[in-house]
Amino acid sequence: GLVGSEMCIRDRHCFDTDGHMFFEVTEDGKPLRKRRYVFSEGFAAIAMAEYALATGEKEYAKKALDIFKRTLHFLNAPGFLEPKYLPTLPSRGHSITMILINTASRIRMVIDDPSLTEQIDTSIAALRKYFIHPEFKALLEMVGPDGEFIDTCNGRVINPGHCIETAWFIMEEAKYRNWDKDLLQLALQILDWSWEWGWDKEFGGIINFRDCRNLPVQDYSQDMKFWWPQTEAIIATLYAYQATGDEKYLQMHQQVSYWAYAHFPDKEYGEWYGYLHRDGTVA
């Protein structure tokens, strides 16, 4: 079928000879761009795991696990991936830490391997140790190698959508472990903090970026409403309500759902716009 064909095309055209994926290719598979990230690998592994689940084709479960292990190798091989910043500013980032939780969780649905739960544990431990900063009631996007607060524009950034996404990744893992209380408490703390930072009390919706010291945010899209933080909040609040039965989370779920469905869909064609201004008008 079509999905299988797309998988074959991806296998043939989207991997460079070193095993690292291209970020963009042409319609007929010629490489356009290759980036220093490994998010393409993570999403490809998730797609292959879901394909294996839908079709029963175990070959794709093995492919997903292979990509996952290769990704871990890339992340741990000194010099393979270009650092975001030169050694002048040693740092670690929230994004890859959190996406590895979801990637490992998706693959674990279709194939068993100890590296998967090990990575989930490693990522959650890193979130606790480095990224959660109670002094700001926030999970920060970028910190020093040992979790140090970096008092710059980038070091102060809170990405509420990312943090809310992390919260439901951890809730999903808590559910997998029979609603593990410690994991659930961690996830709810992140959700509560991030909702407080992210929900726009004036116009509604989850805002793009905040500064943990309430200083001006450098990113020019900082006060916009992108589609994906809203969907992460819709998922996370429903998970929280399922886990706790607390009506607060049901109200939050309804609040963000109503706002998103009132503002993002194209009223004529139904598809969602990707980006809105702060007041909810189409950007």
Located regions from the model:
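Short, small-residue-biased leader/transition segments that mark boundaries at the very start
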Residues: 2-9
